[in-house]
A protein has these predicted regions:
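Intrinsically disordered, low-complexity coil segments
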Residues: 67-82, 476-483
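N-terminal single-stranded DNA-binding subdomain of primase/primase-helicase replication proteins
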Residues: 45-67
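Short, glycine-/polar-rich solvent-exposed loops and beta-turns at beta-strand/coil boundaries
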Residues: 35-44, 66, 179
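N-terminal export/assembly segments and adjacent metallocofactor-ligating motifs
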Residues: 1-16, 24, 32, 36, ...
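Short, basic and Ser/Thr-rich N-terminal targeting/leader segments
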Residues: 41-46, 236-238
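Long, low-complexity segments enriched in small/aliphatic residues
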Residues: 617-692
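Non-catalytic alpha/beta scaffold blocks inside enzyme catalytic domains
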Residues: 348-635, 687-692
Length: 692
């Protein structure tokens, strides 16, 4: 550690730390525009100038100078830096004056107003009048896609957006052209950005040059109520903030969570907001003479009860989709047990994961944060760029830092980092496990190898054998103590919670494929599973939020609450227990799903043993205690991996294909979003990758 004095406060800090970071550690506030902790240093805004005692007789850019670059005093005193001296104040005022020379007076009509770094710093270092008498420069706005609006006259050329697309997103969508006062930020030939993370440039932009196009002129930040929650558009559980005004969700922003999403979110997470308002189910419906007709809750429950009374438990099934919370799964499981039904399943894509194999058999055991320590990665049957863009960015970060070798088994993909393509399917994985492929030596030499196993490898008929083979490979590697190489990447937010709860078929029970076959069951309770096709014959009760495929097939519709309208527990792909918080209320007569199931159970004559969400959770925590530990990970046992590897089975030569065909349209909320539909239309174009 090195000693340094900041404004008279002596601190110990790593020698590689910048003066800006040292100042923050000492409690000093240093303004900046171009510097960002997760991007490379550019040093081009000069707003972070400080005075260095004994250094050059001019202010220094604190973001670009490290503590180790400073000389100690003549008697060995620690180097001294001043952040509030007259020299510093005058220098920053000069920089601010130059920045404002060409900046338009757009604050009253700028969407960044109230959240603008330039506004805040102009208050501290700006002047009330300008000495500049020449004409201001104007820059033509650029089209860069349906998500990001540009008003480039406001741009101060901090290059945060350029560095983000090149370094984090890995697409190199944006760049800087021309020189001097003619410099401009643009995309190549003014085409739409291709990254699934492009919305993050809006958060990074310190001025109003890049703003959210769908949110344009919608609200001011001081009008909004802010609720901390999590995202359920994929299985990562990114930390988000939901901003509402009245009953309406207006925008979703990221929250910092170093262990999960750092401070990035995907474009689907951010811009699915309009889907929360469109095509909503706001009242119960009952199918009469082949047509769905609006009904009261009593009429809907009566129709269900009448049908259930004509059959028995073994002819009733329960299916839960990817947006179902743990509380709802628990209520569904209790209702199924009370009716005598063994037919329950939450694995709507047909994955062969099962809780009987132990928790380690279906978790991302190394954890998301553990990717930062991985020294060899093989991706099997997954396209992380489509399935979990934020996790993909983390893999890229690790690859950029250490050039960690990455290999892929499955479909050929356009990822954002260099990788070796080993083959298409299970036979390639088998050859890798036998050591017949050169990359096997790379895995053996690694101390923290990572085998990312996607659902594309597990949904086939040989899915169980593929899982066993991957576990056998993971167990054969010599790894650092405490490291588990097997990492299951899920695509649904409710999948791990369902497996933890044992929401899988009981003895003699049917899985999703079996339940949906014609004539298999008389009644199916479908909770938000809109990606399945239920064949004719069964009476379908759909509990969900949108008029999607599930509602179209239903005989009775019971409207529920979306993830922004209820408090619910979810478990992400690494096994971290998380919770959504209510930011708004369901529309019309829609109700929270647990309350719907509780009321329905009364009418069916099988009252569920809870009368409130708190009571439901008490029973849930008794059944599965680790659900009570919010933001904690209950890890799996390494011995489970060894046992799983011994199961074996025949692996076919079928190719692994990612279950996500269209990143933007994976669930009913996204499919109801016009913004996501626009993005989906553009996504058919080839993806771009940064040139390294």
């Amino acid at each position: 550690m090195a000693k340094i004095k900041i404004d008279g406060v002596e601190i110990d800090i790593a020698p590689e730390a910048t003066l800006l970071q040292a100042a923050e550690a000492a409690g000093a506030e240093v303004p900046r525009f171009c510097f960002h902790e997760r991007l490379s240093v550019a040093g081009n805004c000069r707003m972070c100038l400080v005075e260095v005692k004994g250094g050059p007789p001019k202010p220094q850019a604190s973001c670009a100078m490290a503590v180790r670059d400073l000389r100690p005093g003549p008697n060995g005193e620690p180097p001294e830096v001043f952040t509030k001296s007259p020299m510093v104040k005058k220098a920053r005022e000069g920089v601010m004056e130059f920045l404002l020379i060409n900046h338009p007076l757009d604050c009253p009509i700028c969407d960044q107003g109230g959240e603008c770094d330039l506004q805040d710093q102009a208050m501290a270092y700006g002047v009330d009048s300008t000495r500049y008498k020449e004409n201001k420069r104007a820059v033509e706005d650029k089209y860069i896609g349906p998500l990001v609006k540009t008003i480039m006259t406001r741009c101060i050329q901090c290059t945060r957006c350029v560095r983000f697309t090149a370094e984090v997103a890995g697409t190199g969508d944006m760049g800087l052209i021309s020189r001097g006062e003619d410099v401009e930020i643009t995309t190549y030939l003014e085409t739409a950005m291709a990254s699934e993370l492009q919305g993050n440039v809006v958060d990074l932009c310190p001025v109003g040059a890049l703003t959210s196009k769908p949110y344009e002129f919608t609200a001011r930040p001081w009008e909004l109520s802010k609720t901390e929650s999590i995202d359920i558009m994929d299985a990562l559980g990114s930390s988000i903030r939901v901003d509402t005004r009245g009953k309406e969700v207006l925008r979703i922003l990221p929250r910092i969570n170093e262990a999960v999403n750092e401070e990035w979110i995907s474009d689907k997470t951010r811009h699915v907001v309009d889907g929360l308002k469109s095509q909503r189910l706001d009242r119960p419906y009952v199918r009469v003479a082949g047509k769905l007709k609006p009904a009261s809750w009593g009429e809907a429950f009566a129709a269900i009860a009448a049908k259930v009374k004509t059959t028995t438990g073994p002819k009733i099934g329960f299916i839960a989709g990817d947006l179902t919370s743990v509380e709802e799964l628990h209520a569904l499981k209790l209702l199924a047990a009370s009716l005598g039904s063994p037919h329950i399943d939450a694995r709507v894509d047909g994955t062969k994961l099962h809780p009987a194999n132990g928790r380690a058999s279906y978790l991302f055991n190394a954890t998301i944060e553990g990717i930062d320590q991985a020294d060899a990665i093989v991706i099997v049957g997954s396209n992380p760029r489509r399935e979990a863009p934020v996790l993909n960015a983390r893999i890229r970060k690790r690859w950029l830092k250490s050039k960690v070798p990455v290999a892929v088994i499955g479909e050929q993909m356009n990822l954002t980092y260099d990788h070796a393509y080993l083959g298409a399917g299970g036979q390639t994985l088998s050859a890798l496990a036998r050591g017949e492929i050169a990359f096997a030596e790379t895995l053996k030499a690694a101390k923290n190898p990572l085998i990312i196993l996607g659902q594309g490898a597990l949904v086939g008929a040989d899915g169980a054998a593929v899982l066993s083979l991957a576990a056998k490979l993971a167990a054969s590697l010599t790894v650092t103590e405490g490291w588990n190489a097997l990492a299951i990447l899920h695509t649904g937010a409710s999948r791990v919670g369902g497996l933890d709860l044992g929401f899988v078929p009981g003895e003699g029970g049917l899985d999703v494929a079996g339940q949906t076959k014609a004539g298999a069951l008389d009644v199916i309770f479908n909770h938000s599973a809109d990606e399945i096709a239920i064949e004719p014959g069964a009476f379908v009760v759909y509990i969900g939020t949108h008029g999607d495929q599930g509602a179209h097939r239903a005989d009775v519709i019971l409207p529920g609450a979306a993830y922004t309208e209820k408090s619910g527990t979810f478990v992400n792909t690494e096994g971290r227990v998380q919770m959504t918080n209510r930011a708004a209320f369901p529309p019309g007569d829609a109700r929270e799903d647990w309350a719907v199931l509780r009321a329905l159970s009364d009418v069916l004559g099988h009252r569920l043993p809870f009368g409130s969400l708190a009571e439901l959770r008490r029973g849930l925590y008794e059944a599965v205690p680790h659900f009570a530990a919010i933001d904690q990970i209950a890890g799996g046992e390494a011995a489970d991996i060894a046992r799983l590897g011994q199961i074996g089975g025949a692996v076919s030569d079928a190719a692994f294909v990612s279950p996500i065909k269209d990143f933007y349209l994976t669930n009913p909320i996204a499919r109801a979003s016009k913004t996501m539909a626009s993005c989906s239309g553009l996504a058919s174009k080839p993806l771009s990758v940064a040139a390294e």
